[in-house]
């Protein structure tokens, strides 16, 4: 079967919206900081709960926090300390796209993740 690729934005959005869960996981990759990139010799890695990230785009640029949760359905991450204020004054977490953050510290509790990273010893 031949795969037809389109450059139309509506078809790109539809493809992301209709993507199966194993593909959505790939959309949750975030770039590593310069020091981590040097250490692990990788540019991007999947964000997991517990990683420390720094926001690089948007209204919350420069803010740093720990990932509190991951929404695979909407392909967004929830960062501790990044929130919006509702009209009634309550704070609600602000979901952020994984490509708009930079991983500054990795959570290395998972042995499989450490093996996959490899890197310099």
Curated annotation (Swiss-Prot):
Does the keyword Ribosomal protein feature in the UniProt annotation? Answer: yes
**What are the protein's GO molecular function terms?**
rRNA binding; structural constituent of ribosome
Q: Which keywords are on file for this protein?
A: Ribonucleoprotein, Ribosomal protein, RNA-binding, rRNA-binding
Show the Pfam families listed in the entry.
KOW, Ribosomal_L26
The family classification in the record reads: Belongs to the universal ribosomal protein uL24 family.
What Gene3D superfamilies does its record include?
2.30.30.30
Q: Where is this region: Disordered?
A: 1-23
Q: Does the keyword field hold rRNA-binding?
A: yes
**Lineage, top ranks:** Archaea, Methanobacteriati, Methanobacteriota, Stenosarchaea group, Methanomicrobia
Quaternary arrangement and interactors, per the entry?
Part of the 50S ribosomal subunit.
Alphabetical GO biological process terms:
translation
Q: Which InterPro entries match?
A: KOW (IPR005824), Rib_uL2_dom2 (IPR014722), Ribosomal_uL24_euk/arc (IPR005756), Ribosomal_uL24_KOW (IPR041988), Translation_prot_SH3-like_sf (IPR008991)
GO cellular component terms listed in the entry, alphabetical order: large ribosomal subunit
Q: Which domain of life is it from?
A: Archaea
- Describe its function: One of two assembly initiator proteins, it binds directly to the 5'-end of the 23S rRNA, where it nucleates assembly of the 50S subunit. Located at the polypeptide exit tunnel on the outside of the subunit.
Q: What is this protein called?
A: Large ribosomal subunit protein uL24
